[in-house]
Amino acid sequence: MAAKEVKFGDSARDRMVAGVNILANAVKVTLGPKGRNVVLERSFGAPTVTKDGVSVAKEIELKDKFENMGAQMVKEVASKTSDIAGDGTTTATVLAQSIVREGMKFVAAGMNPMDLKRGIDKAVIAVTEELKKLSKPCSTNKEIAQVGSISANSDADIGEIIAKSMDKVGKEGVITVEDGKSLQNELDVVEGMQFDRGYLSPYFINNPDKQVAILENPFILLFDKKISNIRDLLPVLEQVAKAGRPLLIVAEDVEGEALATLVVNNIRGILKTCSVKAPGFGDRRKAMLEDIAVLTGGQVIAEEVGLTLEKATLAELGQAARIEIGKENTIIIDGAGEGSRIEGRVKQIRAQIEEATSDYDREKLQERVAKLAGGVAVIKVGAATEVEMKEKKARVEDALHATRAAVEEGIVPGGGVALLRARANLGTLKGDNHDQDAGIKIVLRALEQPLREIVANAGDEPSVVVNRVVEGTGNFGYNAATGEYGDLVDMGVLDPTKVERIALQNAASVAGLMLTTDCMVGELAEEKPSMGGMGGMGGMGGMGGMDMGM
């Protein structure tokens, strides 16, 4: 086992904070409508230009292992916020840096880190409650467009196209983002269905960039039991191979010899296949398989209807224009099912909704209707160059996450104002002791930091703007894009409540862990032995026969 280097107390914390600052300073230049870009080196090809906080954070690895530990912990804040809320990564990073920076001053002054953390946690609970009170539902297309455009760095076109796509497929509908062929953004709405089951083996992936398996014009085999013996599958595989088209297998499970054979055939290019587990459980699984059959014009191979796997023919297989299978989701686009059959199926499910007694059953049935009737919206991102395309696509995906979060939990005034207003009751909040009160003060100071960074990136004086905004009430704030003060909701500067809440909770969680750290253990760098002297290279003395006296 390699030797370790151990740091204690202030020397450990100082190195950790240095790492936090390096990462946070790189990320926070992107905050706000006038935030700057960050250019990321790539080992091959053009560098990536981004204004996405989490993309910047993920690239940073520091040489000093103790500084790197601090940076990695803040990177976790950004990643976690991105995973849950889909946006707000830069805000979360700025909050974490501020809580750590302020908190370390109190720790250095001799306060108890555990009490500081308890005070921080109390303050965060109070602020999240206040955010919920400030929040209002996001229901109109105009509000959805405004949230989208703010998240996409004040790009109104992106906000508009997201609002349109949500209008077409519903707020719970499936929206995907693809590379476009022109300079303009385009919106395609395709009949389709998404269910939450992904590929059974990563060897089915044929698009490494997106980590998905894409099948164009495939057949779809629907089976209600497990498949483990390849002999049962061979007859239908041979028919599909002759037809020269890919195959998606949806079954209770595909395992053992059957899965191995499918993977080998796929890798060798003999037959392009992918297999996924059927969605749902028990009776719901049968119903959802039937939904897929109706949508794709196929039949579920089940013994109860007199069909067996060995005798299955192409006539029983469903078909679709395109299927995209990810790690956790499968999207069937443009199934070959008849419109009248799909309508009949939707009516049948709606009748079941009316008869359903439990909320859970009703919700699951409504999900099935949405999947059958909703379709899939595809936003095609247009750009002049590949570098611009990647940057724009990342912004569209961020904006999409933000609008979903807004629909889910509502909206609050943006521009860092909601966090400032949510401090309202922190002035009167008391901890159990003096150190906990200090923890509450840390959060009080941290909540103005996002606004300060937005203003600084816009080239204005943060303290002047913060004081002016604090004097105002409600939605009054500073619009950094135009340099004006006013009602931010009327100006269309909105943030999803969920994004603000998750950013604060994650930042406080990781910052609290850092404040309570008193020891760090890292790998000790191995000293490479020196090569030693070459020792005069004996035997070369004088090189006789050469007259040096020229």
From Swiss-Prot:
Cellular component per GO, a single term: cytoplasm
Record's keyword terms, sorted: ATP-binding, Chaperone, Cytoplasm, Isomerase, Nucleotide-binding
GO molecular function: ATP binding; ATP-dependent protein folding chaperone; isomerase activity; unfolded protein binding
PROSITE patterns: CHAPERONINS_CPN60 (PS00296)
Residues binding ATP: 30-33, 51, 87-91, 415, 479-481, 495
Reaction(s) catalysed (UniProt annotation): ATP + H2O + a folded polypeptide = ADP + phosphate + an unfolded polypeptide
Compartments it resides in: Cytoplasm
Statement: the UniProt record of this protein carries the keyword tRNA-binding: no
Listed GO biological process terms: protein refolding
Enzyme Commission numbers on file: 5.6.1.7
Family of this protein: Belongs to the chaperonin (HSP60) family.
Subunit record text: Forms a cylinder of 14 subunits composed of two heptameric rings stacked back-to-back. Interacts with the co-chaperonin GroES.
PANTHER family according to UniProt: 60 KDA HEAT SHOCK PROTEIN, MITOCHONDRIAL
General function of this protein: Together with its co-chaperonin GroES, plays an essential role in assisting protein folding. The GroEL-GroES system forms a nano-cage that allows encapsulation of the non-native substrate proteins and provides a physical environment optimized to promote and accelerate protein folding.
Protein name: Chaperonin GroEL
Natural source organism: Aromatoleum aromaticum (strain DSM 19018 / LMG 30748 / EbN1) (Azoarcus sp. (strain EbN1))
Underlying gene: groEL
